[in-house]
A protein has these predicted regions:
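N-terminal glycine-/serine-/threonine-rich beta1-alpha1-beta2 phosphate-ribose binding loop
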Residues: 1-30
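Donor/substrate-binding cores of folate-linked one-carbon enzymes
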Residues: 29-161
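Residues at alpha-helix termini
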Residues: 4, 26, 74-75, 266
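Internal anion-binding site segments
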Residues: 145-276
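Short beta->alpha connector loops
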Residues: 13-16, 37-39, 218
C-alpha cells in the first residue's frame, strides 16, 4: 500500500546499518511513529526533535510485550485498551501520552479485538500527534506496580489445548487465539491469530487435527469430564472441569473453516470418539 501511495519503503537487514541511519537523519523528521515493531536502537529513536512514539495495544504498564491482544483475552480480562507513549531504552516502558479503554465481553475474539484497537488506535495516534504539534503533551511515568502482567510472544506449545484446564480457561484460550471476525470473515494473519487446536480421534482411530475458531462456555458441570455430547445436527459439547464448552466453528487441517452443523453433517460423532 505504501508503494502504491509512492511512500519510500526501506527494509534494512540491520536497524544499525549506517546507510539506513543516515537516510533517517536526512529526513530531518520532527517525529517518528512506531506500531507493532521490535525494539529500536537509541541512535534511531533519538533522531527526531520530538522523539519517537509508539502505539501499544494494551493499557500500559500491564501487558508489555509482543502479544497483548492475545494475552488479555487468554487471561479473561474484562477491559483492555490502547496507549501512546514515548519510546526509551526499555521495551514498552516510556512515558505515557494518551490512553483509551475498551470493554471486553466474555466472547470477544483476538481478531475482533485486533480490528477494534486498529481503528481506535488510528484516532489516538492522530490526537497524540496533534498534542505534540501544539506542545500540549503532559506525559506521565508508568506506574511501577509490583505485579505487572506481561504479554510474551506466543509459542507453539500454547496453542495446543490442554483438556485438563478448566472450561472457562479453555474457552478464553480459544477466543484469545481465534481469527474469527464474523460468520463470513476470518482474520488471515496467523501471527496474530494462530488458533487453538486439538486432535479428535474417531472410533476407527482416524485422527482429525482441529483448529477451534469459536466456542461458547457454560458453567454446567453435571456430566462426566471429557465426555462428548451432540445431537448430530447443531451442537457439539465437551464436558470439562468446572463447566462445558460448545464448539461453534472449526477448521480441519488443509480445509476451510466451517460451522459445527456443517461438520456434523459429514461426521457422525459418538461417545467413543476421543479428544486429545
Amino acid at each position: 500500500k505504501a508503494l502504491e501511495l509512492k511512500i519510500d519503503v526501506k527494509t534494512p537487514i540491520s536497524l544499525k546499518n549506517e546507510e539506513f541511519v543516515s537516510y533517517l537523519k536526512s529526513l530531518e523528521a520532527d517525529l517518528f511513529i512506531v506500531v507493532a515493531f521490535r525494539l529500536l536502537p537509541k541512535e534511531i529513536w533519538k533522531i527526531p526533535r520530538f522523539g519517537t512514539i509508539n502505539l501499544h495495544t494494551s493499557l500500559l504498564p500491564n501487558y508489555r510485550g509482543a502479544a497483548p491482544i492475545n494475552r488479555v483475552l487468554i487471561n479473561g480480562e474484562k477491559e483492555t485498551g490502547i496507549t501512546t507513549f514515548f519510546i526509551d531504552e526499555k521495551i514498552d516502558c516510556g512515558k505515557i501520552i494518551l490512553q483509551e479503554r475498551v470493554d471486553l465481553s466474555e466472547n470477544t475474539t483476538a481478531a475482533q479485538l485486533h480490528n477494534i484497537l486498529m481503528h481506535k488506535g488510528s484516532n489516538l495516534l492522530e490526537n497524540t500527534i496533534n498534542l505534540i504539534e501544539q506542545n500540549k503533551v503532559n506525559s506521565i511515568n508508568q506506574e511501577k506496580e509490583l505485579a505487572i502482567k506481561e504479554a510474551p510472544k506466543l509459542n507453539k506449545e500454547l496453542t495446543r489445548i490442554d483438556w485438563n484446564m478448566e472450561a472457562k480457561d479453555i474457552h478464553n484460550l480459544i477466543r484469545g487465539l481465534s481469527p474469527f471476525l464474523t460468520e463470513k470473515e476470518n482474520l488471515k494473519d496467523v501471527s496474530i491469530c494462530p488458533s487453538a487446536w486439538f486432535n479428535l480421534i474417531t472410533e476407527n482411530k482416524k485422527v482429525f487435527r482441529v483448529k477451534l475458531l469459536l466456542s461458547r462456555f457454560t458453567k454446567q458441570t453435571n456430566n462426566k469430564i471429557l465426555s462428548i455430547e451432540t445431537d448430530q445436527k447443531s451442537f457439539f459439547k465437551i464436558n470439562l472441569n468446572k463447566g462445558s464448552i460448545f464448539i461453534e466453528k472449526l477448521q480441519l487441517a488443509g480445509k476451510n473453516a466451517i460451522n459445527i452443523s456443517q461438520f456434523l453433517s459429514g461426521n457422525k460423532l459418538n461417545e467413543k470418539w476421543i479428544i486429545s
